[in-house]
From Swiss-Prot:
Free-text note regarding domains: The N-terminal domain interacts with the head of the 30S subunit; the C-terminal domain interacts with the body and contacts protein S4. The interaction surface between S4 and S5 is involved in control of translational fidelity.
Assigned protein family: Belongs to the universal ribosomal protein uS5 family.
Biological processes, Gene Ontology terms: translation
Subunit record text: Part of the 30S ribosomal subunit. Contacts protein S4.
Descriptive protein name: Small ribosomal subunit protein uS5
Gene3D superfamilies linked to this entry: 3.30.160.20, 3.30.230.10
GO MF assignments: rRNA binding; structural constituent of ribosome
Organism (species): Methanosarcina barkeri (strain Fusaro / DSM 804)
Domain S5 DRBM: start-end pairs: 48-111
Name of encoding gene: rps5
Superkingdom of this protein's organism: Archaea
Pfam families per UniProt: Ribosomal_S5, Ribosomal_S5_C
GO cellular component: cytosolic small ribosomal subunit
């Protein structure tokens, strides 16, 4: 999405990005400064894509009566390692989606990819480097390295998350109530984050 031309940065990192002193996401991450403005992501990742995973109507009873809001769950990514998941609520669907997109941008992370399948030795970053598992609520998702050309063997929600992260080939195992789109997406996103927990050997690192 295009960033607002009238954006006035309020954070130190935002000012550095606006001044051109930080010109890439790699530099932003290495700076150690928190990303608190979605416009930073708009400027550093102009090819970022977003997709709505789920929209639910939630209700809450108050003293003044029943309050109804819409909860939107959105995934963003550039299909090349950067991916973020966000959710937000609002009384209208449109604002809920926009808030969820901003939340996903602020939660964006870089996922290391590799060629971790014993059936493949291409050395390209097309799958996860090793088996990882993520959990959210009752849902558990395990990502298993797959050979190049297999594709994504996963449910619809998990596939959307993995595609935005740039994963092209992977086996998956799921447990729990995967009909819950929110927890299914969160568990898949958590599994991707587990890749960054372990230190990667040299042969698993992506090409520059």
């Amino acid at each position: 999405m295009a960033f607002d031309e009238e954006w006035i940065p309020k954070t130190r990192l935002g000012k550095l990005v606006m001044e051109g002193q930080v010109a890439s996401m790699e530099e932003a991450i290495k700076s150690g400064l928190p990303i608190r403005e979605p416009q930073i992501i708009d400027m550093l990742l102009p090819d970022l894509e977003d997709e709505v995973l789920d929209i639910n109507m939630v209700q809450r009873m108050t003293d003044s009566g029943r309050r109804v809001k819409f909860r939107a769950t959105v995934i963003v990514g550039n299909r090349n390692g950067y991916v973020g998941l966000g959710q937000a609520k609002d009384v209208q669907v449109g604002p809920a989606i926009r808030k969820a997109i901003d939340a996903a941008k602020l939660d964006i992370t870089y996922i290391h990819r590799g060629c971790g399948s014993w059936e493949c030795a291409c050395g390209l970053p097309h799958t996860v480097p090793y088996e990882v598992t993520g959990k959210a609520g009752s849902v558990s998702v395990t990502l298993i390295p797959a050979p190049r050309g297999l594709g994504i063997a996963a449910g619809n929600t998990a596939t959307k998350v993995l595609e935005k992260a740039g994963i092209k080939d992977v086996w998956t195992k799921t447990f729990g109530t995967t009909r819950s789109t929110l927890n299914f997406a969160k568990a898949t996103f958590d599994a991707l984050n587990q890749v960054n927990v372990m230190r990667l050997p040299v042969y698993c690192k992506e090409e520059a």
